[in-house]
Amino acid sequence: LERTLKYLEAKFGEWFPQIEWLNLGGGHLMTRKDYDIEHLINILNSLHKRHPHLRIILEPGSAFAWQTGYLQSEVVDIVENHGIKTEILNVSFACHMPDCLEMPYQPEVRTVNTTDNSSSTARKIKEEDITTNNTTQKSLVTESGNFLYRLGGNSCLSGDFIGFWEFDHELTLGEQIIFEDMIHYTTVKTHMFNGVSHPAIAIKHLDGKIEILREFAYEDYKNRMD
């Protein structure tokens, strides 16, 4: 923001006396732990002193929902084709996480062991960095000895997947896959392509209790089509 303002004033400052409002945009993650709030305040106060007639607008955007909710999925199938293992989840990247395909926004991915609630984080792997056994088959085990999977969604869209991820163990059916920090995208951009249901909305209390606020069914999709 500080660099942007310097450029903005240098290039467009001569027109500032003719405007009443200045919108500095969004994307300011001021709720992030290492965000320098005091520096932000000083920058805005300094700008206001230079141009006291301006009404300055700042859009915190996703800062309101930063790290406030994750998308929980489950492995429902694991398929292998030409040496590539794809774990099919009960969520859809096209329907529930379109930013992962469009931007692409890449959330942190982790697994949860439902037996002891232990968790491990997966690592995103670039396709060009994957070693090949031959011209058509990619290695299912990385050089570090970890296991390679592609994450696939549950819609009929052929492009409903997001790349390759490295896990420290072999995945099994029923295993939970968590997509961190997804609530601010999932809740506003999700859609019901071909009847794929919205994820349920729930609160996880400090004592571990899960409270379901809203669940969706086929009738929700049907009513939208009426």
Write out the residue ranges for each language-model feature.
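Charged (often Lys/Glu-rich) extended helix/loop segments that serve as interaction or gating elements
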Residues: 43, 55-226
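Active-site loop/helix belt of alpha/beta enzymes
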Residues: 1-82, 194
